[in-house]
A protein has these predicted regions:
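Conserved, helical-rich catalytic subdomain that frames metal- and/or nucleotide-binding sites
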Residues: 172-228, 236
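A generic structural motif
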Residues: 53-55, 121, 133, 223-225, ...
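Short beta-strand segments
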Residues: 51-53, 77, 115, 131-133, ...
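Acidic (Asp/Glu) carboxylate-rich active-site/surface patches
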Residues: 97-139, 149
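Short, acidic (Asp/Glu-rich) active-site segment that either coordinates a divalent metal cofactor
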Residues: 139-169
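Conserved RNA-binding domains used in RNP assembly and mRNA/RNA metabolism
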Residues: 173, 218-265
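N-terminal lobe of the biotin/lipoate ligase/transferase fold
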Residues: 1-107, 253
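Residue-level signal for inorganic ion chemistry
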Residues: 29, 76, 101, 119, ...
């Protein structure tokens, strides 16, 4: 089953609150949705999702480009208005988006993990990347747009990226993009609404634990690199603000914000 790509609004069956905008091609689904939020006469409804058959300038973390063969993968962005989330706690949004992708892919194969902060891996290979863009309103998150690219049916990757993999390469089967999108949106919606109702913070704590359990290279010593060079360390923790905590061979704890440390793959 393939998408019929047109620039129009539809809805996912049985989920009328999830409007879908399907595009044949765009430079970036994140940029398209952000422009829609900023310039449309009325802001798009929460959960509005833009999906493209092809992106000409898809971006991931660290400014990396995202290679995707037209029509072979799942490329989309969705919008949330999580004004109930304090800016200092915004990492929880990255956690629930990452978990929703991971758990949807878990239904198709084993070995799926989350590479901090939010890449999705199958063993040592990258199957999904995302770019989450937040807009602040005072000390709250006024808008969150996660942009996600999942490698589904592409079997040849020509970019210099070191370790891409698709679901088809893993299992040998073709996959239906609307089915996987629907599954992701349902999972994200469940997490998001539970977070909205989380008055005592217990749900956020449970999410942090689930996220930690799902992390790539959760056990053992592994190579990393920071501004001072390469070193071996084990994963110790991820703090509520998203800081990555490693324990090196000497037992010293090292804390990093995003882009301050890299995995050596």
């Amino acid at each position: 089953m393939n998408f019929t790509y047109k620039t129009k609004m539809t809805t996912i069956p049985e989920q009328p609150s999830f409007p879908i905008i399907r595009l044949e091609e765009t430079d970036s689904t994140n940029r398209y949705l952000s422009d829609l939020c900023d310039n449309a006469p009325a802001a798009p409804a929460e959960n509005t999702t833009v999906i493209a058959r092809f992106q000409t300038s898809g971006k991931g973390q660290r400014g990396n480009s995202w290679e995707s063969e037209a029509g072979q993968n799942l490329l989309f962005s969705t919008v949330l208005y999580p004004r109930f989330v304090e800016a200092r706690r915004q990492f929880v949004l990255s956690q629930i988006v990452s978990l929703a992708v991971k758990e949807e892919l878990d239904t198709y194969t084993e070995g799926i993990t989350i590479k901090w902060p939010n890449d999705i891996y199958w063993h040592e290979k990258k199957i999904c990347g995302m770019l989450i863009e937040n807009v602040l309103e005072g000390n709250r998150i006024g808008r969150c747009i996660p942009g996600i690219g999942i490698n589904l049916n592409q079997t040849v990757f020509r970019s210099p990226a070191p370790n891409p993999v698709s679901l088809k390469q893993i299992t040998g089967r073709d996959y239906d993009a609307p089915t996987i999108l629907n599954g992701f949106l349902r999972r994200l919606h469940t997490y998001y609404e539970a977070l909205r109702r989380d008055e005592d913070g217990r749900f956020a704590i449970s999410i942090a634990r689930r996220y930690a359990d799902a992390l790539f290279r959760r056990e053992g010593l592994h190579p990393y690199e920071d501004a001072n060079g390469r070193f071996l360390a084990r994963l110790a923790d991820v703090e509520p603000d998203g800081r990555f905590v490693l324990q090196d061979e000497a037992g010293r704890l090292r804390k990093y914000l995003f882009k301050e440390v890299q995995y050596i793959l």
